[in-house]
Amino acid sequence: MKTLNRRDFPGAQYPERIIQFGEGNFLRAFVDWQIDLLNEHTDLNSGVVVVRPIETSFPPSLSTQDGLYTTIIRGLNEKGEAVSDARLIRSVNREISVYSEYDEFLKLAHNPEMRFVFSNTTEAGISYHAGDKFDDAPAVSYPAKLTRLLFERFSHFNGALDKGWIIIPCELIDYNGDALRELVLRYAQEWALPEAFIQWLDQANSFCSTLVDRIVTGYPRDEVAKLEEELGYHDGFLDTAEHFYLFVIQGPKSLATELRLDKYPLNVLIVDDIKPYKERKVAILNGAHTALVPVAFQAGLDTVGEAMNDAEICAFVEKAIYEEIIPVLDLPRDELESFASAVTGRFRNPYIKHQLLSIALNGMTKFRTRILPQLLAGQKAKGTLPARLTFALAALIAFYRGERNGETYPVQDDAHWLERYQQLWSQHRDRVIGTQELVAIVLAEKDHWEQDLTQVPGLVEQVANDLDAILEKGMREAVRPLC
């Protein structure tokens, strides 16, 4: 069986216009996949040079396959049908290592056609590293490497304003573009680079903050033999991902034209502020996960897919989203409902086995950040507590018993909560404290909740009633009236 290369698999090759820091699965099934579609359907005509930003020889370089690799996108489409689509990606030309090919790395700045910089160097990638110097070959941190590359471009083109770059980080931190820009400016000042360069950074370059959303499941180790048999070739860089994707970019409106999104619309939004989209994702996608997990798991289910195929649990989650979360969010309702519909479709994806226990990690913090704001906003708006979000809190407290049908399961959270719950549930079993007292102790933890939740009218009583129902009847019976 042949291995992918451009000689045996000839096809389009595009001029290099994009630098990409990061060779991982996510960028290849997200950014490079989108660039490939735009190259095919428009005159974007842009090839990607992947820069490996860390010193590692594993995985091997994409250049061993001349930049070629296959994405397999699978999940439920807009009609709810299971689809699996294999695509040979030709947008990547080559990969270089900034550690072993530093001169080649700097030379990227000399190419007048270079226009975009994408990156995903993990959440820790956009950070300051004390001691990074201009003359390091290379510096340690990604922002320092980028500063050096930008200065190379500024110098090579004598500060030409038409030679700036559009810089689009995909790291999962809030306002990643702003954070990256601040660090680049910090290095420029630390290294005493000319004032003209600092002005050029602001005048000629755009740092765009982003929200990225796609579950990328990466190399399909367990299915490789079967998939390669179907494809008819060997691919060491096979990359799998879900059908859904969303790319929100906070940047100039002209970006839509530059990326040719006006000619071939993708699920890419160019916006003035990513904040409402971030809030939407946290509240609907992450919030639904967090509400679902303790309810579904204690109802005897193990994966998100099983939960969504269970009529009662699915109804509970959908009503929580549409009746209690969406009404308190600050975006047009049709946009929110469209996003919610995509989310529930993603939860049903038969190709992804998302274990409920893995999502349950740090459940107390997740509840505070993902559900509590909507619970409190709903109570404020209507004067009554949202029934399902409140029930989800009771289910979460019950989950920390660590026992289902007589069998124990691992609960992962910070030591404070694990010890606290062990003590509280032990006291409850010994009838030292009642359910309402247990709930009041949990809700009074100001350091965690950032307020005293026992002061929210009716919250202790309702959570305690729900918790008693769960303990006395079991999760199935307790949740049924809310389905």
Swiss-Prot record:
Leader sequence residues: none
Catalytic activity: D-altronate + NAD(+) = keto-D-tagaturonate + NADH + H(+)
Protein biosynthesis is among the record's keywords: no
GO molecular function annotation: mannitol-1-phosphate 5-dehydrogenase activity; tagaturonate reductase activity
PANTHER family from the UniProt entry: ALTRONATE OXIDOREDUCTASE-RELATED (PTHR30524:SF0), MANNITOL-1-PHOSPHATE 5-DEHYDROGENASE (PTHR30524)
GO cellular component, one term: cytosol
Matches recorded under Gene3D superfamilies: N-(1-d-carboxylethyl)-l-norvaline Dehydrogenase, domain 2 (1.10.1040.10), NAD(P)-binding Rossmann-like Domain (3.40.50.720)
Positions of NAD(+) binding: 18-29
One GO term of the biological process aspect: D-galacturonate catabolic process
The protein, known as: Altronate oxidoreductase
Family: Belongs to the mannitol dehydrogenase family. UxaB subfamily.
Metabolic or biological pathway: Carbohydrate metabolism; pentose and glucuronate interconversion
Entry EC no(s): 1.1.1.58
Keyword Translocase: no
Gene: uxaB
HAMAP family: Altron_oxidoreduct
Lineage top rank: taxon: Bacteria
Keywords, ordered alphabetically: NAD, Oxidoreductase
